[in-house]
UniProtKB/Swiss-Prot annotation:
<keyword id="KW-0694">RNA-binding</keyword>
<dbReference type="InterPro" id="IPR036935">
    <property type="entry name" value="Ribosomal_bL9_N_sf"/>
</dbReference>
<dbReference type="InterPro" id="IPR009027">
    <property type="entry name" value="Ribosomal_bL9/RNase_H1_N"/>
</dbReference>
<keyword id="KW-0699">rRNA-binding</keyword>
<comment type="function">
    <text>Binds to the 23S rRNA.</text>
</comment>
<dbReference type="GO" id="GO:0019843">
    <property type="term" value="F:rRNA binding"/>
</dbReference>
<comment type="similarity">
    <text>Belongs to the bacterial ribosomal protein bL9 family.</text>
</comment>
<dbReference type="GO" id="GO:0003735">
    <property type="term" value="F:structural constituent of ribosome"/>
</dbReference>
<protein>
    <recommendedName>
        <fullName>Large ribosomal subunit protein bL9</fullName>
    </recommendedName>
</protein>
<dbReference type="InterPro" id="IPR020594">
    <property type="entry name" value="Ribosomal_bL9_bac/chp"/>
</dbReference>
<dbReference type="GO" id="GO:0006412">
    <property type="term" value="P:translation"/>
</dbReference>
<dbReference type="Pfam" id="PF03948">
    <property type="entry name" value="Ribosomal_L9_C"/>
</dbReference>
<keyword id="KW-0689">Ribosomal protein</keyword>
<dbReference type="InterPro" id="IPR036791">
    <property type="entry name" value="Ribosomal_bL9_C_sf"/>
</dbReference>
<dbReference type="InterPro" id="IPR020069">
    <property type="entry name" value="Ribosomal_bL9_C"/>
</dbReference>
<keyword id="KW-0687">Ribonucleoprotein</keyword>
<dbReference type="GO" id="GO:1990904">
    <property type="term" value="C:ribonucleoprotein complex"/>
</dbReference>
């Protein structure tokens, strides 16, 4: 099934590209999520007229994401105190919600989807690398330092 991508999709194509995908992927994911439209003659003509507006919108989203990533760069690390048992293991785990809570205290608003934990939830005391990805093309790393709560 031929579709026109309305936004950049990793490993598929850029905005405005006409790509061939499986019909189930198009009908069940791309089209309902507003990431693509069917590539009929009528849609291709109307999309060409809207292309400039969509490109401006994508550029503005990218600039906003880059400015948010610059804020993250200034922080570099976040410290989260936690109860610790023997051998440096914490009771429970530190997840995305805990990290977002600490970032909100620092005055930085982030969504749950923008934080990625490469090794899963954090269960050890020490420094852990976390990924902040507000946009497909923008990626920034920061450190979460888990310390013992006394």
């Amino acid at each position: 099934m031929e579709v026109i991508l309305l936004s950049k999709i990793k490993k598929l194509g850029d905005s405005g590209a006409i790509v061939h995908v499986k019909s189930g992927y198009a009908r069940n994911f791309l089209i309902p999520k507003g990431k693509a439209i069917l590539a009929s003659k009528k849609n291709i003509e109307s999309f060409e007229a809207q292309r400039v507006e969509l490109e401006k919108e994508n550029i503005s989203k990218l600039l906003i994401a880059q400015s948010r990533a610059e804020k993250i760069k200034t922080i570099k690390s976040i410290t989260i105190p936690s109860k610790v048992g023997k051998e440096g293991k914490i009771f429970g785990s530190i997840g995305i919600r805990n990290i977002i809570k600490e970032m909100n205290l620092l005055g930085i608003k982030v969504n749950k989807k923008e934080i990625k934990l490469p090794n899963g939830v954090l269960r050890q005391v020490g420094e852990h690398k976390v990924i902040f990805q507000p946009h497909n093309e923008v990626c920034e790393y920061f450190i979460v330092n888990i310390i013992s709560k006394k």
